[in-house]
Regions:
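Core Rossmann-like FAD-binding/catalytic domain of the broad FAD-dependent monooxygenase superfamily
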Residues: 2-391
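Helical substrate-recognition/capping region of FAD-dependent monooxygenase/halogenase enzymes
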Residues: 2-17, 32-33, 89, 101, ...
Length: 546
């Protein structure tokens, strides 16, 4: 048996328009899965300004699995708390060290550096970004979502004005907020534009602002944020009440100092302005992420307030979700309906992020004295509770989002807390293998060291450690040889806390947990759930006879 849908595999490349973090993540992922790609960007050179700054825990986990984490950690500056000030005093802290991840902080790193790390990875994978190349027209070849049919015809124009007509299997719009593809398809980018103007800058400062915390100040006319990038280099963002009318002039150091002094009670001296700009917040999103063979991700699909540092992370995770599914369908290893789950899963996350960042922005930017008095009185109470700390750190870090409502997620009788659609927690475990004599041998590992981001991993969790996997199991799963990795795990020895976390997650009995390539769970069941699992596999990834 082999896995695949006969005569349904593709040959044409996937065209990615836009080479920011979203587009480069798509290129990296699709290439890893053996899908030919073209990635174009109309800019001749990469941007050198920092723009997005925060890399969240969930993104760091995904980057670790793809070999990018060491360079990120070498350059980035971790922030372990977010301190909120108002009325000249500290109102409370969000304790980021409570994030349920190995990366229990926000890593502050210039977007230009994040893009450099992704570009270097593309070079290692043999991918060249076609810069100075713009897609000027496109059309869908056929109104069909069936694999092996249809496609997208695109017209590209390079920096010399040379035109090229390209047929692609799929098109990914990662062009940013002014997506030509979105406009051409007349898709509604629903939401609102905030009236406030903001000053944004990278600069250095002297004073008592911590190097390992996000410092956020509330004021009657808006808010001020000062975020450490390391070595006294900071990102500065503030509501600029005097610039509500559209203006193209960049704020000066003197203007930034004035904004700081008006909003903060902590004396500092700003210096050495690296760059600055003004902007307004748009809070908008598409309500569909797919038009047949065309997919949207990142700012082409959603833009929102920078509150919480979610934007770039959301775009990267859009492509982590889409790419493995697109690759499976491209290779003929999955039913075409798998692609519908991209929109199912990511739209729910996007709606939540847009809603929550908009609420926070409206509150902090309110010109109502009453609202700011409420913040000053309520924030200390809320931030002192463990529940609010858990909720806030889970959402900020993006480790709390799940795909439980997805049609791809199936839970079948479980005893632990994990459900299909959840992110796999990175626990310390014992792994079990059989030696040449059939005897079980164990080793110790982290779950994220075990799972394979290029295929599914079936974890057989718990049960008797000396019991080998049943030959019947292996026989029933044989149609998916090479498609999924089978691994027995038990709690790590001599670690009481690790056993508590293991039992809380998987239950005290034996369970079957199928981990997707993006480390979310596709199927969760107890030890008798193998028939339900094979039915699930047949539904989405049916094998066929040679």
């Amino acid at each position: 048996m082999r896995l695949g849908l006969k005569e349904k595999s593709e040959t044409k490349p996937v065209l990615i328009v836009g080479a920011g973090p979203t587009g480069m993540t798509a290129a990296m992922e699709l290439s890893r899965f053996g899908v030919p790609i073209r990635i174009v960007d109309k800019l001749l050179t990469p941007s050198t300004t920092s723009r997005a700054l925060a890399v969240q825990s969930r993104t760091l986990e995904l980057f670790e699995q793809r070999g990018l984490i060491q360079e990120m950690l070498r350059i980035g500056n971790p922030a372990t708390a977010a301190t909120i000030y108002g009325n000249g005093k500290c109102l409370g802290q969000v304790h980021l060290e409570q994030i349920k991840s190995r990366y229990n902080y926000i890593l502050l790193i210039s977007q230009a550096e994040t893009e450099r790390i992704l570009r270097e990875q593309l070079v290692r994978q043999g991918i060249a970004i076609e810069r100075g190349t713009e897609m000027i027209n496109f059309s869908q070849l056929e109104s069909s979502s069936q694999a092996g049919q249809g496609g997208v015809k695109a017209v590209l124009r390079n920096f010399e004005g040379v035109l090229e007509e390209l047929e692609a299997a799929y098109l990914i719009s990662a062009e940013g907020s002014h997506s030509m593809v979105r406009h051409a398809l007349n898709l509604q980018f629903q939401g609102k534009s905030h009236k406030q103007s903001y000053a944004l800058a990278d600069l250095y400062l002297d004073g008592d602002i911590p190097d390992d915390e996000l410092s956020i100040f509330t004021a009657e006319h808006g808010f001020l944020g000062v975020f450490p990038m390391g070595n006294r280099h900071f990102r500065f963002i503030a509501t600029d009440p005097e610039k509500h009318e559209k203006t193209d002039d960049d704020p000066t150091l003197a203007e930034l100092q004035k904004l700081y002094d008006e909003d903060s009670h902590i004396p500092v001296q700003l210096r050495d302005l690296t760059w600055s700009s003004r902007f307004r917040i748009n809070s908008r999103m598409l309500h569909t992420l797919r038009e047949d063979r065309i997919f949207f991700g990142g700012d082409a699909a959603h833009v929102h307030s920078p509150a919480g540092g979610q934007g770039m992370n959301t775009g990267i995770q859009d492509m982590i979700d889409l790419s493995w599914k697109l690759a499976m369908v491209w290779h003929g290893k999955a039913v075409p309906d798998l692609l519908n789950t991209y929109e199912e899963e990511r739209l729910s996350v996007i709606r939540g992020i847009v809603s929550k960042t908009e609420t926070a922005t409206d509150a902090f930017n309110s010109d109502s004295v009453i609202v700011h008095q409420l913040i000053a009185h309520i924030a200390p109470v809320l931030l002192s509770t463990q529940l609010v700390q858990q909720l806030s750190t889970g959402l900020i870090s993006e480790v709390a989002w799940n795909y439980r409502a997805s049609s791809l997620s199936q839970t079948d009788r479980v005893h632990g807390n994990l459900r299909a659609g959840d992110r796999l927690p990175d626990l310390d475990v014992s792994i079990w293998e059989s030696d040449a004599s059939g005897n079980a041998q164990s080793g110790k590992a982290r779950l994220y060291e075990i799972i394979d981001p290029s295929r599914f991993t079936l974890l057989v969790a718990g049960g008797e450690s000396t019991t080998d996997l049943s030959p019947t199991w292996k026989e029933q799963l044989s149609p998916w040889d090479g498609f999924l990795k089978l691994q027995r795990i038990t709690p790590a020895p001599n670690q009481p806390e690790a056993k508590i976390q293991f039992d809380r997650s998987f239950g005290s009995g034996q369970s079957l947990v199928l981990v997707r390539p993006d480390s979310y769970l596709g199927f969760v069941g107890d030890h008798d759930a193998l028939p339900a699992l094979t039915k699930w596999l047949n539904q989405w990834f049916p094998p066929i006879a040679n």
